From Swiss-Prot:
Keywords tagged on the record: Ribonucleoprotein, Ribosomal protein
Signal peptide interval: none
One biological process term in Gene Ontology: translation
Pfam families cross-referenced by the UniProt entry: Ribosomal_S21 (PF01165)
Keyword field contains Cytoplasm: no
GO cellular component term, pick one: ribosome
Listed GO MF terms: structural constituent of ribosome
Family recorded in the similarity comment: Belongs to the bacterial ribosomal protein bS21 family.
Natural source organism: Thioalkalivibrio sulfidiphilus (strain HL-EbGR7)
Protein's name according to its UniProt entry: Small ribosomal subunit protein bS21
């Protein structure tokens, strides 16, 4: 859990904004949303496999675009 020390004479809104930013960088909200409901192990594997396919397709499309620019 990220924590932020409030500096002297620092407005509450500024400290809250810094805390929100650190939570965003740490991925707290995405983790909470992901763990909100139970996910079956098969669903986890399917999600990871789909993400891997998506990454591979993105990598291939970037490679093809790079090759086209070279000629």
């Amino acid at each position: 859990m990220p924590h932020v020390r409030v500096k002297e004479n620092e407005p509450f809104e500024v400290a809250l904004r810094r805390f929100k930013r650190t939570c965003e960088k740490a991925g707290v909200l995405t983790e909470v949303r992901r763990r909100e409901f139970y996910e079956k192990p098969t669903e986890i594997r399917k999600r990871k496999a789909a993400a891997a396919v998506k990454r591979q397709a993105k990598r291939v499309s970037k490679e093809v675009a790079r090759r086209e620019r070279l000629y």
